[in-house]
């Protein structure tokens, strides 16, 4: 019996040594798969009459209101998607996560500004005054203190923004209403100079009536995401290669330059390969984007030349007939 016990013990000991030797020969870990490469997707745009065409989103949310992401992620998304500037515009009145992240309305901006500086993204300080219609939701951009907008009376909140030199934008005028209307309060705000711009595109909606108001009232045009989710979860980039954005014709790539351009109404709206704006600006973008070669071959009836799009804006030819000033009847 003793002999059997010794043999069994010896066998177990030998097996343990073999297993230890085999384990020592194995690598500690084997990596399978790779992390997604985080690269910036540039959108080439032309310079126009000395103005830089900057790519901006002036309406995004974070966990500091009813968004689901941290402010730094908004900056990282903007960098990857080729933007130059974003405005974090968390709701003043609606902060479901307030008990977890704190009550200060300046927190999101303060948290994101270092990441923005590191990635060369212009970060605009703002907040969304969120009331039922009328007046609806209004973004106050370029404010110094977002906490000052936390007022029970919405007119006091808008006045507080105006006193800080803010640019005030009416958000998604057609969202959540039976009919889109320019109310008396909007006329009052407009006459006071407290309503400076309007979203004609928001998330997945564009508002033709709002475009008419912008032309009639000479308001600045905006197209923004109003993103609460992760951008890549919100938009199917198989349908489009860019998020909705506001293109700003700025004198320079600075926050002050953008602010000046907004008050001067030098903006275009770009969404789903559609470029929207005032005719004179659209014409300038079109002309600055195209390079036309000299005529390189001629016949009695035809002239041959090349037209090159030097930007990443897609242009579709609706009519391939070109007319020259000296031969308007030639085709």
Model-derived features: where do they sit?
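Bacterial N-terminal signal peptides that target proteins for export
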Residues: 1-7
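Hydrophobic h-region of N-terminal signal peptides that target proteins for export
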Residues: 11-19
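A metal-dependent hydrolase metal-coordination microenvironment
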Residues: 33-165, 171, 180, 193, ...
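Structural recognition of alpha->loop->beta junctions
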Residues: 185-205, 245-250, 255-256
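Short acidic/histidine-rich active-site segments
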Residues: 219-235
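Catalytic cores of secreted or luminal carbohydrate-active enzymes
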Residues: 238-286
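Surface beta-strand/loop "capping" patches
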Residues: 269-310
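Conserved small/polar residues in nucleotide/adenosyl-binding loops
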Residues: 323-330
């Amino acid at each position: 019996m003793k002999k059997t016990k010794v043999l069994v013990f010896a066998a177990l000991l030998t097996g343990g040594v073999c297993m230890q030797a085999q384990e020592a020969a194995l690598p500690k870990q084997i990596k399978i798969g790779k992390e997604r490469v985080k690269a910036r997707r540039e959108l080439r745009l032309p310079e126009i009459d000395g103005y830089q065409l900057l790519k901006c989103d002036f309406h995004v949310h974070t966990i500091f209101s009813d968004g689901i992401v941290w402010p730094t992620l908004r900056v990282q998304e903007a960098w990857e998607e080729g933007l130059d500037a974003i405005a974090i515009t968390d709701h003043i009145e609606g902060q479901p996560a307030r008990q977890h992240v704190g009550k200060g309305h300046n927190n999101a901006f303060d948290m994101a500004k270092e990441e923005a500086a590191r990635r060369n993204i212009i970060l605009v300080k703002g907040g969304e005054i969120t009331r039922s219609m009328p007046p609806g939701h209004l973004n106050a951009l370029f404010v110094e203190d977002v906490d000052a907008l936390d007022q029970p009376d919405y007119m006091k909140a808008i006045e507080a923004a105006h006193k800080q030199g803010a640019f005030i934008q009416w958000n998604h005028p057609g969202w959540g209403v039976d009919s889109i209307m320019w109310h008396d309060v909007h006329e009052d705000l407009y006459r006071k100079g407290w309503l400076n711009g309007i979203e004609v595109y928001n998330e997945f909606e564009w508002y033709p009536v709002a475009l008419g108001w912008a032309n009639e009232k000479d308001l600045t045009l905006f197209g923004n995401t109003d993103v609460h989710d992760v951008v890549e979860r919100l938009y199917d980039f198989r349908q489009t290669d860019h998020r909705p954005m506001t293109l700003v014709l700025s004198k320079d790539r600075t926050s002050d330059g953008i602010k000046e351009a907004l008050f001067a109404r030098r903006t275009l709206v770009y969404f789903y390969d559609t470029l929207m704006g005032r005719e004179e600006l659209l014409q300038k973008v079109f002309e600055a984007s195209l390079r036309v070669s000299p005529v390189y071959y001629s016949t009695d009836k035809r002239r041959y030349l090349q037209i090159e799009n030097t930007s990443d804006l897609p242009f579709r030819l609706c009519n391939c007939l070109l007319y020259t000033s000296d031969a308007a009847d030639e085709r």
